[in-house]
Every structure is written in structure tokens, then in C-alpha cells.
Amino acid sequence: MLFKKNFLFLLFIASHFAGLTQKTNSDKLLTTFHSISSHEILEFAEELSADKYKGRLSGSPEYLEAARWCARKFEDWGVLPANNGSYFQNFPNAFTEVYSAGSFLYTTTDKKEIKYTFPEDYFPGSNSASGTVSGEMVYVGYGITAPELGYDDYENVNVEGKIVILESGTPYTKNDTTLVKWTPYAYHRYKFRNAVKHGAAGLLYVGKIANPNTVHLENFVYVHIDEKVAEQLFTDSGEKYSEVKKSLGEMKPVSFALNPNQIVTISAETRHFPDAESCNVVGLIEGYDPELKDEVIIIGGHLDGQGFLGEVFPSALDNASGVADILGAAKAFAQSEIKPKRSILFMLFGGEECGLYGSRYYVENPLFPIEKTVTMINLDMVGNGTGFFVSNGKSYPKLFEHFEKANEKFLHREMAASEQRKNYGRPRSDASLFENAGIPTFSLWTRNSVFPVYYHQPLDKTNVLTPEIMEDAAKLLYLGILGVANDSGL
């Protein structure tokens, strides 16, 4: 009888203290959860969007300084250097420094001069050669020469010494196996090289967005022009730009020379640095479980932006916002009393805007084996909206449920998800390279924009961010990733 009483007493004590431990862990979780602050996360975004970093063009001294600032934050919080004692993973990254907006002058058929203005009418080319070119214009559609596909935009036109006007993309747009054949011709680099191969002296690239994902070619000057400029140039030549562009979808080239009395003159003031390097910033929270700590969860987002093109492109939403959210989550994990069983790798990619340089380098030179990578979560433009969208969430329900439960219990935001869909075109995000490597990959986005989205524009400033959704994004990362990290059933 005495033994039975003692057993029951010990059972009561054990269950009582188990309850206290559970409550303590809950308190610890809430303490960390509430420590994540919209004010601090906005401060991170404001710092990275500051003029002193000149838009964080990958490879530039200003980008490297922004990377060092992020690394210092990791160090201050106790996030470990992930690359053999270093917070940096370096890779080659040529870049072009743009010193001014340059100029863009149009001389009409009746000799009237129209001086187009930056940033209303054009952006200078991020990789333009320095100098001035002047000449007649030839429209070459997509600028593609693909004999095996029976398609050539340069057939029956002479562009030698002239300024070509061309479009991004390809005439084939369906996401199926046929698109694979067209994908090599979708790259901006290909289009530029093909223009030079055909003798073009310069380029008007239709679509006024900043774009470092091009190529620097000696003596080749180019600008990005607004569609309204293209419309004016076509109208003065007796054509309607919108109708010509629409006809491109018929899979037939529509190239033609504009009136030879129409002359454009474009100039750029730049310097190219072919041997520059950039870096990913890599920080680590080590897992504590002896069997699971060799497995890793990656949280990534690109640190680089569009740089300086006559004025600073702050690149606040794209992607200081995503980096700020990641920093908020990293600080929370570093200071949390609840530790993860699996390791967590925080990655701030360089070179995304230049062509996914940093993420490609990591996938080819991983710090953790690919087969030990449980999931990769990418953040890009996560700072303007009232809800969340998780790409690929429905395809990995055992992983995604940790984020769903966190949102339902603590955040109560509208959150939607999609199935993973094979992309037959060129990869467009850091996440796509991890996905192609066979890693379960999510992309976290904000939805229901509160402010206009100034994609690759100088107006992409911190005044168009919604700090409340950024705070909740960091909280969602903390809770969801902690759930994945401590799920022994995965």
C-alpha cells in the first residue's frame, strides 16, 4: 500500500513538472515571438535602402559594405559564421558602374530635336558601354536568330551601324516542353550579343525597368525605353507600335527599318569592372540534436538591388524587405531559449538581379550536402500587403503545415498556397535553382498590396513598405521553421 502511494505521488510530481516544463517552453516561445518588432525590421530595411549603399549593385563596393553590415548583425546576435569561420561565400561578379543618366536625343524627320528625360522616358543601361552612338533605327522584334526553329528577326533587314529596337522575351510563351527550345533565346545577354553580331551600333530596349541581368559589350551603348517612346518613334514612321507588338504573337518576324530620316543619339557614362567579386552572406544556428543537426533548413533572400542609374534605386521592397524579414527571424532564433534540433542556415544572396549568381554558386558549392537540406524558403518582395502567399506550399504538406498552424494560431493573416509547377523557361528566382536541385522549396510572398509596387524603379523606397506584414513574416518564419526543425517525423 505504501509503495502504491509513493508511486502515485511520484507520478503526480512527474506530471506536474512536465506541465510546468511545457508551460515554460510556451512562455519562452511567446517571449521570442513578441520580441520580433515591426519598428526594428523597418529600421533594417531603411538601413539597407540608404543612399550610402547606392542601390546595392552586386559586386560594387557599396554592395560589399551592405553585406558586411548584415554580417555584423549576425555576429552581434550570436548567429555563427557558416563558411569555415566566415560570414561570406565569394564568387565572381563583373559589374558596371553607371556615373550618370546619360542622354537620349531623338531628331524627327523634320529635324526637330526631342530630348527625352530620365527617369520618365528612359533608364540608362546597367551594363552599357561608355560613349555616344547615333544612327537610324531598325525594329527587330525579339532579336532572335534561330534557324533550327525556322525563325529569324534579322532576316531581310540590315542593321549594320544602326540602332536596333527590340523586345524582351520570345514569340513562344506556353509553359510546355516546346518552350525549352526557345529558352536560350530569352536571355538578355543572347539578344545583345546577337545584335552586335549583326552589326548594330546601339540598342533601344523596350521596357523601362532597371536590369543588371545583361552583358557589357565593348562600344555597345544602350538604354531602356518606355513604351510611349516606342509608340512615338513608330508613329513618326507611319506605324503603330501597339499593333506591331501584338502581331509578334503570330510567330512570324515583323522587323522593319524606320524612316531613315529619324535619328536617335544615345550616350552613357560608365566604367566596367570585369574582375570584380561579390558574395553571399551566410549565418548559422546549429541544431542541438546529435542525429538531426547535420540536416539543414535554409532561409534565403537576395541582398542585391539595381544600383545607381543617374539616381539611387533604393530597392526597398525588392528586396531589402525580404532581407529585413530574414534578419528579424535570425535575431529571434539566436536569442530564443528554445533551440532547434536541426540546423538553420540564413542566406543573403548576391547577384540575383545579375542572373542568380549567388544562389547558383551555392547550389554548386553547398555548405551542407544537398541531400541533407530539408527545405529552402525564399523571400523576395515580402513587405507590401496584408496577406501571405506560399508558392509550392501544397506540394509539401508535412512541411507547410507548420506554417499553416503558426498562422492560424498566432497571426490570423489570409494565407494561400500553390502546387509546385514545372517551369520550362529560364529560371527567374533564387528559389528555382534550389527547386531544380531537388530540394523542397517554398517562396514566401506578400499579397493584397497596400501601396503601388515600383518594380525596378527609383520609387521603390521604404515609404511603400507595410511594417506590420514584415513583422508577421518574420514571426511566421520563426514559428514555422522552428516547427520544421523540431519535427522528428520528417
Which residues does each predicted region cover?
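Metal-dependent peptidase/peptidase-like ectodomains
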Residues: 115-116, 155, 222-225, 230-241, ...
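His/Asp/Glu-rich mid-to-C-terminal helical/loop segments that flank catalytic regions of hydrolases
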Residues: 331, 335, 451-490
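Second-shell loop/turn segments in exported
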Residues: 27-35, 51-61, 126-128, 149-151, ...
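Bacterial Sec-dependent N-terminal signal peptides
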Residues: 1-24
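Soluble metallo-hydrolase cores and metallopeptidase-like ectodomains found primarily
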Residues: 24-29, 109-110, 121-156, 219-315, ...
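Catalytic-core environment of secreted peptidases
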Residues: 35-53, 58-81, 107, 156-158, ...
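Extracytoplasmic/secreted proteins, especially bacterial periplasmic and envelope-associated proteins
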Residues: 28-31, 36, 40-43, 47, ...
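Noncatalytic luminal/extracellular "stalk/propeptide" segments of secretory-pathway proteins
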Residues: 51-173
